[in-house]
Amino acid sequence: MDEQLKQSALDFHEFPVPGKIQVSPTKPLATQRDLALAYSPGVAAPCLEIEKDPLAAYKYTARGNLVAVISNGTAVLGLGNIGALAGKPVMEGKGVLFKKFAGIDVFDIEVDELDPDKFINVVAALEPTFGGINLEDIKAPECFYIEQKLRERMNIPVFHDDQHGTAIISTAAILNGLRVVEKNISDVRMVVSGAGAAAIACMNLLVALGMQKHNIVVCDSKGVIYKGREPNMAETKAAYAVDDSGKRTLDEVIDGADIFLGCSGPKVLTQEMVKKMARAPMILALANPEPEILPPLAKEVRPDAIICTGRSDYPNQVNNVLCFPFIFRGALDVGATAINEEMKLAAVRAIAELAHAEQSEVVASAYGDQDLSFGPEYIIPKPFDPRLIVKIAPAVAKAAMDSGVATRPIADFDAYIDKLTEFVYKTNLFMKPIFSQARKDPKRVVLPEGEEARVLHATQELITLGLAKPILIGRPSVIEMRIQKLGLQIKAGVDFEIVNNESDPRFKEYWSEYYQIMKRRGITQEQAQRAMIGNHTAIGAIMVQRGEADAMICGTIGDYHEHFSVVKAVFGYRDGVHTAGAMNALLLPSGNTFIADTYVNEDPTPEQLAEIAVMAAETVRRFGIEPKVALLSHSNFGSSNSLSASKMRETLERVRERAPDLMIDGEMHGDAALVESIRNDRMPDSPLKGAANILVMPNMEAARISYNLLRVSSSEGVTVGPVLMGVSKPVHVLTPIASVRRIVNMVALAVVEAQTTPL
């Protein structure tokens, strides 16, 4: 490790506070009553319930989402036996990964005990605390004995990740690699370098999936493991000892091998050995940080080889984070008493299948220009693929149920998958009523920036989720090329329609219609013709206006107001409305907050604000939320007579005329809007109850400042929008920072609006 990296790592662990984890309360402790409920005397109630029924611990405590990462520090990474305390940073790091990828809480426990039986007693005594045990960095062969005995004694999952995590990912890689090279697992020969925990676990899984034991040759530090090589050979090694053929070295047995599995050390495999392997060999060189052979060296002599390593700087990284958080997620969610072979195999298959799926936009963004289509350079998913939890956890949970180790079976797997999706997309629960309605009658939605990678990823999502019938504007050759490069599985003419912006035969009709709309706005016929080639938003707008599309989502490129000016000119306002407005939703840990008008009107009049407030309430109801509107100002219920304050008071009067049943009040300060007790101190009889969820600002400046401050102040907050209100057709203008998920969300909203919009 170079000095710069070393110092950066030390600083990372020291500042701003030492370590990487902390305990945060999940219940409020703001009042004396809170304290009485959390501790004495109230805490006695759940204690007595658990005494009557031990399973009640999962209902009243955090046990069901709590895993112990336990180590004695005898085999820490590549550092060896450095002791329990020195291994603590690794155990904390494991805890961070559990939390980050699967929402699982972790206590890291470092046990200063080398005697296996004493270590077992310590861990077994902790069973009442945890929902699962993750054994970490314990040397072989003791790790096999420790895990076996703990599995026998404990009634919660016990999982030695160094064995089974590596085995699960490696096995998934081998299954997919064999599929690429069209070989059968029952026919291939495999040579293994290393006979430690990971290697043995890999072989066990592969045999369970059909690999023949007689086709496996294992080499350890003494050479080939064969029957009779030594007395009292460890059982784990003896299980894979072959008949004595006279061959003693890796170099001798590698000839003709289809697979090399390396769980040993650096530079064990040479180029000369690789040359002797079978057609299209698979090489899993998993030693870290330096593998058994570097991929460029192997490729130099065997360009047909498929290579996996444990490193992130080469394709096909075998990384345990691909599985352990999600295996535990599935096991915990059904109250599994063990992680058995059926659950491991379910994880293998789920991981292997995910590599065949279309690429996630998160992965594409994280890995830049890499080709992430299934093939020799991509046979296992990337660690940052957000879909891992949605694919692996349900598969593991179902396997636990089917194999009889689940104590709390899942009754509704669709609801369970929806819940898991919240780990991937924080907007999932918020958007659920919109998605459900959109699926009932998907509409044609035109996406003018059809060549954009985000739009293409969104199109894939829309098709997968069954939310819409996308129409993309762009050059067909460019769209097809980018779909292939992004590893997507959508097909033009099957999943979506393309409107070629350079040569669509309808363009004469389009520009003629556009000219009729714009001719009194300074647009000539020639300019209208050019708009049909260069202004994709204009093309999409005319398609919606002609009934060739039902809705439009634009704005992922360019300036908001340029897009909006086209939308406003083509569509105008809906009946009974004389203005438009934009609203953004902020999904914060404290609740959902909607802010208007964030984009359209710089200094709206009371009449405009009243229309915006009423339209905002209508939109919020679509999400299944009761609107509670606060009109914000520097003035608090008449404390100022400034023009701004007077404007908001007049707005309130106009809203009450338009929507007398709407829960609304103002003008008020922001804290009064969000905290009922503060509001009641000033206005005890306010009709607004609880925290306001729609904040109507006096002008765009205040709205935009508030929105951006709230957006960046919460690391857990996510946004939806901007939602365009008041236009006669279901159209929304996004901004260039819109994510793929935001595009998907807004398309779904536009579909729901189109379902109720007259043609």
From Swiss-Prot:
Residues 1-428 are annotated as: Malic enzyme. Keywords: Metal-binding, Multifunctional enzyme, NADP, Oxidoreductase. It catalyses: (S)-malate + NADP(+) = pyruvate + CO2 + NADPH; oxaloacetate + H(+) = pyruvate + CO2. Residues 429-759 are annotated as: Phosphate acetyltransferase. NADP(+) binds at residues 195-198, 288, 320. Its EC number is 1.1.1.40. Its cofactor is Mg(2+); Mn(2+). Divalent metal cations. Prefers magnesium or manganese. A divalent metal cation binds at residues 136-137, 162. GO terms for molecular function: acyltransferase activity; malate dehydrogenase (decarboxylating) (NADP+) activity; metal ion binding; NAD binding; oxaloacetate decarboxylase activity. GO terms for biological process: malate metabolic process. SUPFAM superfamilies: Aminoacid dehydrogenase-like, N-terminal domain (SSF53223), Isocitrate/Isopropylmalate dehydrogenase-like (SSF53659), NAD(P)-binding Rossmann-fold domains (SSF51735). The active site is at residues 39, 94. It holds the Pfam family malic. It is an enzyme of class 1 (oxidoreductase). In the N-terminal section; belongs to the malic enzymes family. In the C-terminal section; belongs to the phosphate acetyltransferase and butyryltransferase family. This is NADP-dependent malic enzyme. It comes from Salmonella typhimurium (strain LT2 / SGSC1412 / ATCC 700720).
